[in-house]
From Swiss-Prot:
GO MF entries: adenylosuccinate synthase activity; GTP binding; magnesium ion binding
Organism of this sequence: Thermosipho africanus (strain TCF52B)
GO biological process entries: 'de novo' AMP biosynthetic process; IMP metabolic process
Amino-acid positions noted as binding IMP in the UniProt annotation, renumbered to this chain: 12-15, 37-40, 127, 141, 212, 227, 290
Record's function text: Plays an important role in the de novo pathway of purine nucleotide biosynthesis. Catalyzes the first committed step in the biosynthesis of AMP from IMP.
Name of the protein in question: Adenylosuccinate synthetase
Species classification: Bacteria, Thermotogati, Thermotogota, Thermotogae, Thermotogales
Cofactor binding note of this UniProt entry: Binds 1 Mg(2+) ion per subunit.
Subcellular location per the Swiss-Prot or TrEMBL entry: Cytoplasm
InterPro entries from the UniProt entry: Adenylosuccin_syn_GTP-bd, Adenylosuccin_syn_Lys_AS, Adenylosuccinate_synth_dom1, Adenylosuccinate_synth_dom2, Adenylosuccinate_synth_dom3, Adenylosuccinate_synthetase, P-loop_NTPase
Length: 401
């Protein structure tokens, strides 16, 4: 059995908690894209973990973790995360890392910051974790992979060549990477040939974990305000390096909508309305701490994300955040260039889209009639079944419907 869990919005949908909940029925959770810009918060009854690079797996069962070739790795961050994991759980994760994964180095973070500064008001609003530049170096064929660390002479020769390129192209000095080498030594026992990753995926029940959300995908997201990775479900095969059949596509969305950084957001709520949602949902980034932009659920956009991702079932999170609100707004169409449309053919249209809302009655809690009417309204619009909801921050607070 192979399944994938992914976000249907601009990230921050609660995928980490949902992945952890579902992982109890699988042997391994596989991260196939992204880097330390992800921030998957997983809260148990007695402790909380924030996964940036480690896959989100249920720690109270013998579930393993795989980081595949599609991920760009900040080695120092991963070491810190593993130590934090050990201090909270009392054990180390059963972790395998593909030696084909590329490494985020200090000069990638410098370039990330420099690019944002140069763009000025057109900046994407990245986390400045070096993700985009690391992927760019991969495409430029000057990236460093974990396998490069095995031969120190060749490794230093590559770093020397990269230093020349970065100095000439970007006027950026490549710093000492001794800390990166130290981190590599600590992780070495987890790094395996990619053939071993393929065997593990082929021979076990696998849950693939995406990062960010479909609307941040480098190809089908709200470009250029996207991440550097293929975080859509279409990224699985590239991210693990071989064709793999996935049966279940589990899309996660919030009962409302948030976004970090710049880019179009038709249903963004401003003033007191937006601030109330932000406070209720504690909407601040797990990676950057930045306040998230907040707004109402956008059904045309959700339907678009379902279409491009192939979602077969849905999980709705944070419905409890809206408990007690008298009225809930939901976007059901847009006005674009004077025309009313209930679907988008291109994310470019979002820049000029004016939301058209329906207003529904609020609810007291997830057992209320009005809450179930909200779920039914969404299902009827997007033509997919909501199979689970979460009613609180903990893994144990996910309910199967």
């Amino acid at each position: 059995m192979k399944s994938v869990i992914f976000g249907l919005q601009w990230g921050d949908e609660g995928k980490g908690k949902v992945t952890t909940y579902f992982s109890k029925d699988y042997d391994y959770v596989v991260r196939y894209s992204g880097g330390s810009n992800a921030g998957h918060t997983v809260e148990y009854t007695d402790f909380k973990l924030i996964h940036h690079l480690l896959p989100s797996f249920y720690v109270k069962k013998n579930v393993g973790a795989i980081i595949s070739n599609g991920v760009v790795l900040d080695l120092e961050q991963l070491v810190e995360e593993i130590e934090e994991f050990k201090s909270k759980t009392g054990t180390y994760p059963k972790l395998y890392i593909s030696e084909l994964a590329h490494v985020v180095l200090p000069h990638h973070k410098k370039l990330d910051e420099k690019l944002e500064q140069i763009k000025g008001k057109n900046a994407v609003g990245t986390t400045k974790r070096g993700i985009g530049p690391a992927y760019a170096d991969k495409v430029h064929r000057i990236g460093i992979r974990l396998s490069d660390f095995k031969n120190k002479d060749k490794f230093y020769e590559k770093i020397k060549n990269i230093s020349k390129l970065y100095k000439n192209l970007y006027n950026i000095e490549v710093e000492s990477i001794e800390n990166v080498l130290t981190s590599y030594e600590k992780l070495k026992s987890h790094i395996v040939p990619h053939g071993e990753i393929i065997n593990l995926i082929n021979q076990n029940k696998i849950l693939f974990e995406s990062t960010q959300g479909v609307l941040l995908d480098i190809d089908v997201g709200t470009y250029p305000y996207v991440t550097g990775a293929n975080c859509n479900t279409t990224g699985i095969q590239n991210g693990v390096g071989f064709p793999v059949k996935t049966e279940n596509y589990i899309g996660v969305f919030k009962a409302y909508l948030t976004r970090v950084g710049n880019g179009p957001f038709p249903t963004e709520a401003f003033g007191k309305e937006g601030e109330e949602i932000r406070k209720r949902g504690h909407e601040f980034g797990a990676t950057t701490g930045r306040p998230r932009r907040c707004g109402w659920l956008d059904l045309p956009l959700l339907k678009y994300a379902i279409t491009v991702s192939g979602a077969t079932e849905l999980v709705m999170t944070k419905g409890d955040i809206l408990n007690g609100m008298e009225k809930i707004k939901v976007c059901v169409a847009y006005k674009i260039d004077g025309n009313i449309v209930d679907r988008i053919s291109s994310v470019d249209d979002l820049e000029k889209a004016e939301p058209i809302y329906e207003t529904l009655d609020g609810w007291e809690n997830h057992t209320s009639k009005e809450f179930n009417e909200y779920l039914s309204f969404i299902e009827s619009y997007v033509k997919r079944k909501i199979t689970h909801i979460s009613v609180g921050p903990k893994v144990e607070e996910i309910i199967k419907l």
